[in-house]
């Protein structure tokens, strides 16, 4: 699948309960934006994939995202990723989930003009958390590699980060095995639907 939208999101979810995007085995998918976001309704669309609802990406295929303006993937609720290979280049945030970012597994190469992973909820201090159970992360960010307004929990995974300075300036850093835990955040016991409701 190859989708480019010169003036808005390549994928826009206006209203839904839960949304699943499945990367089929051996598939190579490319989504991009031309660099502008024209208003189509009251929502501030500002990413290649933009969802007002809970969004889950699963499967074992690959997804390449190029955001000449704005973010790579945005969910205004929970952003859940259970697997797949992701190459994201974004002018702003790479992955953004307002209520949470929850990652079970996957391979991530993200280059971003701000934070590579960003979760922030100004209205609810219990949300805005990042929970990562595992995966491989190669993050190059002008801001933070991983930023959360709430708790941050890294259970496992391999992390290589080059950051320009958000919460603090950083040099190249690589870490394998269990990461730091900032609190319980949400659970990762069951991929898919359960991931989106745990921690509520």
Which ranges hold each PLM region?
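A composition-driven surface/loop motif
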Residues: 1-200
């Amino acid at each position: 699948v190859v989708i480019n939208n010169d003036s808005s999101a390549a994928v826009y979810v206006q209203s839904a309960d839960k949304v699943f995007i499945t990367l089929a085995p051996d598939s190579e998918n490319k989504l991009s934006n031309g660099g502008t976001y024209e208003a189509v309704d009251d929502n501030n669309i500002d990413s290649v994939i933009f969802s007002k609802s809970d969004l889950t990406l699963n499967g074992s295929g690959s997804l390449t995202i190029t955001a000449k303006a704005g973010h790579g993937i945005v969910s205004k609720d929970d952003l859940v990723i259970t697997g797949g290979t992701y190459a994201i280049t974004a002018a702003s945030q790479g992955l953004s989930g307002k209520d949470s970012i929850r990652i079970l597994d996957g391979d991530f190469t993200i280059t971003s003009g701000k934070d590579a992973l960003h979760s922030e909820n100004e209205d609810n201090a219990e949300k805005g958390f990042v929970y990562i159970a595992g995966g491989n992360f190669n993050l190059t960010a002008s801001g933070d590699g991983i930023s959360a307004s709430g708790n941050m929990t890294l259970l496992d995974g391999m992390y290589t980060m080059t950051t320009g300075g958000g919460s603090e300036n950083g040099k190249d850093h690589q870490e394998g095995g269990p990461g730091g835990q900032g609190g319980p955040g949400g659970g990762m016991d069951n991929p898919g639907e359960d991931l989106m409701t745990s921690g509520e």
